């Protein structure tokens, strides 16, 4: 488990592999960083980068709106789609009251 940003009590240190308050990313020192989306000297996303990880992030850019990021698991679930504005894959499901799984879902 990664610690929460708020769990770290010392001042933020760029290059310690922990994303702390004020940092977008932290991939270690400039000599060791292998993250093409992160500027290791500033712990900020590189110019033009929108994201660095997530099911809706591809090569430092958000995947297009409507791109499937997770398939439906059953008839009560729906395929999850990227918004084009976030690296997160939001969970979609049938609305409450919608019959599914032989009215057991």
UniProtKB/Swiss-Prot annotation:
InterPro entries named in the record? Disintegrin_CS, Disintegrin_dom, Disintegrin_dom_sf
Name a GO molecular-function annotation. metal ion binding
Q: Which UniProt keywords apply?
A: Cell adhesion impairing toxin, Disulfide bond, Hemostasis impairing toxin, Hydrolase, Metal-binding, Metalloprotease, Platelet aggregation inhibiting toxin, Protease, Secreted, Toxin, Zinc, Zymogen
Give start and end of each Disintegrin domain: 11-96
Tissue specificity as recorded in UniProt: Expressed by the venom gland.
* Predominant place of localization: secreted
Q: Which GO terms describe its cellular component?
A: extracellular region; plasma membrane
Q: Which residues form the Peptidase M12B domain?
A: 1-3
Could you tell me the superkingdom of the organism this chain comes from?
A: Eukaryota
Q: Sorted alphabetically, which SUPFAM superfamilies does this protein's record hold?
A: Blood coagulation inhibitor (disintegrin) (SSF57552)
Query: Which pairs are disulfide-linked?
Result: 25-43, 27-38, 37-60, 51-57, 56-82, 69-89
Q: How is the cofactor bound?
A: Binds 1 zinc ion per subunit.
Name its co-factor(s).
Zn(2+)
* Gene Ontology biological process: proteolysis
Q: Which residues form the propeptide?
A: 99-105
Q: Which SMART domains match?
A: DISIN
Enzyme Commission number: 3.4.24.-
Report the residue ranges where the short sequence motif D/ECD-tripeptide is annotated in this entry: 75-77
- The reply on keyword Cell membrane is no
The record, for PANTHER family, names: ADAM A DISINTEGRIN AND METALLOPROTEASE DOMAIN, DISINTEGRIN AND METALLOPROTEINASE DOMAIN-CONTAINING PROTEIN 28
Give the family per the record: Belongs to the venom metalloproteinase (M12B) family. P-III subfamily.
Subunit description: Monomer.
Name of the molecule in the record: Zinc metalloproteinase/disintegrin
Q: Specify the species.
A: Gloydius brevicauda
Q: What is the lineage of its organism?
A: Eukaryota, Metazoa, Chordata, Craniata, Vertebrata
């Amino acid at each position: 488990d990664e610690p929460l940003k708020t769990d770290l009590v010392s001042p933020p240190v760029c290059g310690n592999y922990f994303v702390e308050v004020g940092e977008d990313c932290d991939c270690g020192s400039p000599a060791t960083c292998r993250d093409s989306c992160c500027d290791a000297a500033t712990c900020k996303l590189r110019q033009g980068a929108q994201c660095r990880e997530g099911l809706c992030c591809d090569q430092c850019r958000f995947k297009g709106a409507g791109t499937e990021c997770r398939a439906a698991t059953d008839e009560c679930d729906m395929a999850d789609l990227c918004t084009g504005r976030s690296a997160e894959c939001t969970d979609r499901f049938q609305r409450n009251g919608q019959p599914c799984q032989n009215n057991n879902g």
